[in-house]
């Protein structure tokens, strides 16, 4: 229910907080549901509470996305970098950093990150990696 947030789902999570509020999986899914509903502050609070119990790649990406939506770019980048350190073979954190640099108009850093993405070896081929590399190539061609 976290990935299809409705008011009922969010209300169910809220009702379960007193019982499951120390379960990191519950907290993560609750934070995702709140984020999906656009409740950035509540989502951030729950995600940070989750982080006290759990160090997780997906949680760092979620925190980065929340901070990005709050226009707190330094915090967003920090969480994307933590996700990248946790799973160095993954492309998504690098792409999120690249997209952040483009969003704030830092062409120099965006280009450096683009080169890193394009030169990064692929451990396991996927559609996501194909999309990321194709998008970065297109962006560089449009420069």
Language model features: what each stretch is:
Residues 17-18, 48-52, 81-85, 119:
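Conserved structural position within tetratricopeptide repeats
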């Amino acid at each position: 229910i976290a990935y299809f947030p409705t008011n009922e789902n969010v209300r169910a999570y809220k009702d379960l907080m007193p019982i499951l509020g120390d379960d990191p999986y519950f907290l993560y899914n609750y934070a995702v549901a709140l984020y999906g509903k656009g409740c950035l502050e509540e989502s951030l609070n729950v995600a940070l509470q989750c982080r006290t119990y759990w160090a997780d790649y997906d949680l760092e990406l979620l925190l980065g996305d929340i901070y990005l939506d709050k226009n707190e770019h330094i915090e967003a980048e920090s969480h994307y970098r933590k996700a990248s350190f946790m799973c160095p073979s993954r492309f998504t954190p690098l792409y999120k950093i690249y997209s952040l640099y483009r969003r704030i108009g830092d062409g120099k850093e965006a280009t450096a990150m683009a080169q890193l993405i394009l030169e990064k070896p692929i451990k396991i081929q996927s559609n996501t990696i194909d999309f990321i590399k194709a998008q970065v190539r297109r962006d560089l061609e449009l420069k």
